[in-house]
Amino acid sequence: MKRFALLFVLALGTALPASADTLADQVRAEAARLLAQVNVASNAAKARPAERPQPVAPALSADMQRFGLAASRLSVEIDQRGGPTDLRCIFRGMSEEADKQLTAAAVAKTGADQAQAYARLTHMLKDAVDIAPAVGGLPPKQTDAAKASAAQCPATRNF
């Protein structure tokens, strides 16, 4: 019974960012929360630059994947609302970058390599905290989703 209660509390705790007012608020809150987790992991990796790094914590991996999904959903929402292409592309890129850097951290051969992947995640998460509020002032959703989804993002940029 205690295990069930613990699982329920953990599930409730992970759902709290999802209760934010809007998807943009959720992305911002999740990014702010993840910054602390990534900072702890980064410091651990920096402490052992030439040694084999610690594995990526399962909680960090799951939380980053959830952030990537929320960023992707926000990109689609911006698209449907006819929002600026640059915002749509930024959040689509964040979704892709979260997965890419999480993979880089997981396969890193040294702490220095892993710290570099975490540094990129930190940079991206700080951008998410700063940029997500700009999505709040978009007009209501368009009814013609096909028109919005036809827009393409320009070439991607590596961090």
Feature map (PLM): residue ranges:
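N-terminal secretory signal peptides that target proteins for export/translocation
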Residues: 1-2
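Sec/Tat signal peptide C-region and signal peptidase I cleavage site
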Residues: 16-21
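Alpha-helical segments in soluble extracytoplasmic regions
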Residues: 23-95, 101, 117-153
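Membrane-helix boundary connector in multi-pass membrane proteins
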Residues: 105-114
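Short, solvent-exposed mixed-charge patches
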Residues: 156-159
